[in-house]
Amino acid sequence: MSNVIVFGGHGKVALLTTRILSERGHTVTSVIRDADQSDEIRAHGGEPRVADIQQQSLTDFAELVRGHDAVVWSAGAGGGSVDRTWAIDRDAAILSVQGAKQAGVDRYVMVSWSGSQLDHGVPQDDDFFAYAQSKAIADAVVRDSGLQWTIVAPSTLTDDDATGSVDWDGSSTEVPRGDVAHVIADVLETPGTAGNTIRFNSGSTPVADFLRADAV
């Protein structure tokens, strides 16, 4: 079993991922900003680590991830200010990648979104631009990192019940957060997904089968 560190540990997807991983026997360290969230992290099977990712240097990130087998980046500004979006979704994300490399943690999973690409087409005067551009830049850094990376790129998230099945066939534009968590957990247990961007939404293909096909 592996020792995984999850950034953005109090987010909905991260909490669900922590529960799945802990139930499968993995050890999960959840990085959170607020110590008051610690009890909820423990209730989901994780061990809280309090750190403000906006204030961490490269050295700080390297020390946070050192000793773990894998990094999951599930942090985000969550619709905050533009400055905070750049600071978390781009700058802190990039530092986490560089920190993993510096610390010798080879496995890295970035939680992104299905539209993330440098030619995303979002106008600069659109409120969504900072997020779209931040994710595209961070994902590009992940791909060029030399790490054993996987980018998990779901479509629009919902709080519907998880189904355990996904697809990428245009039949849906949404996916439950629980299924995203399932994909993240299975990606960590499927080495063949390294070097791939996994785009998906709700569907009828069991997650394990979907990932095996994507990893071919």
Language model region names:
Residues A93, S134, V152, G170-D186, ...:
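Substrate-positioning beta->alpha
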Residues S2-H26:
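N-terminal Rossmann NAD(P)H-binding glycine-rich loop of SDR-like oxidoreductase domains
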Residues P176-V216:
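Alpha-helical substrate-binding/gating segment
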Residues F7, T27-T29, A35, A77-D144, ...:
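Conserved Rossmann-fold NAD(P)-dependent oxidoreductase catalytic core, especially the SDR/UDP-sugar
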Residues S30-L95, G99-Q102, E189-G192:
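NAD(P)H-binding glycine-rich loop region in Rossmannoid oxidoreductase-like domains
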Residues H120, D159-G164, V187-N196:
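Glycine/proline-rich active-site loop of Rossmann-fold NAD(P)-dependent oxidoreductases
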Residues L118, T150-D169:
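Flexible, glycine-rich beta-alpha linker
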